[in-house]
Amino acid sequence: MRNKKIICLLAAGLGALLLTGCGGENQKTYEQANADLEQGNYDYALNEYQTCISAGYKLSQSYRGSGIVKLRTGDYQGAIDDLTSALNDEKTGKSDQKDILEYRAAAELKAELYDQAMADCQTLAEDYSLNANDYYLTGCVALAMDSYDEASSNFSEAYGSDSTYEMAIQIYEAYLGQDMEADGTRYLEAALKTEAKTADDYCERGKVYYYMDDYENARTELTTAADKGSTEATLILGMVYMAQGDTSNARSFYQQYIDADGDDPAKGYNGLALCDISDGDYDSALQNISQGLGDATSDEMRDLLFNEIVVYEKKLDLSTALSKAQEYGQTFKDDDAAAKELTFLQSRVGNQAAAGDASEADTSNESTAEESADTGTDESSEESY
């Protein structure tokens, strides 16, 4: 009898140890998924969240994380489905429900499901206290639905709640996307009335002037920011000079950014690649893209890989460009410019095959790839969520 008790106790202890071990592994996987999400390592994060979901671990949070990854990588319907699963989990608290509703509305906006997005925005307004990002999101949805007065009202609330340079730029970009630049410019002008005090302030002011194509004032503000220690200012100075076609000065500032920000040099390498493309030095562009990819987050990888397509097209290596564009489209499903580029390349490669001689392909219908080269400045509307 005593031996049986010992065996039972050992079995119970072993079972508890196994359960604890599984729980510990699931916790590590979940924590790593959160870290990968924050760092923009979306492929890893998605696999880790899916592992947690399969294990039934922290289902609400894991579905939420998976939904955010899919939102940021262009799988909008997948994001909506996962975020809905998170909302339907009985363990999801009220504050978490608000957060998930915000993300789902952003995914619905991106998926052009405007009625559903507005319904979620209305639920937020009815059940929760709104913050600046909520007003901004609602404004974006209203703008997409051509409800201009409602959009204006919500954008005014957003800027009133968060009168920062960043919010002004986001509202400007929302209007710019609807060919209503003048409506957005007034927010940039309002932001410039704020007195700069810190390096970040001067950097943001320089960014505003950059968006307004006022490059002289942009250089002044950004130079002050750089002198005060802003690394980002050197990157944007490179963009300012690049916009003016001064690749020599642009290179200098992009290199300064790389040297100063050793932990995240990818944007600087992307800038150098843009200079190379402009100068027609395509082999150097590929080298800089390769170096940038070695340290790139998923968002930075998007810019670099798009520009890689551009380079191969400029080299007239259309087969490689097509292959790269197909790979890109599988990863970044929401990029309209890349989708157009893919269609163009499919047509060109098909025509070459039909002609039977790639060297005689007509280049008169050259795509706008160079003009579309990704500077990495896009700030999509869901980034606040």
Where are these regions (language model features)?
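Short coil turns that delineate tetratricopeptide repeat
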Residues: 57, 91, 95, 128-130, ...
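Register position in tetratricopeptide repeats
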Residues: 38, 72-73, 110, 144-145, ...
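Start-of-helix register in tetratricopeptide repeats
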Residues: 27-28, 61, 95-99, 133, ...
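C-terminal motif of bacterial Sec signal peptides marking the signal peptidase cleavage site
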Residues: 18-21
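Canonical tetratricopeptide repeat
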Residues: 65, 99-103, 136-140, 170-173, ...
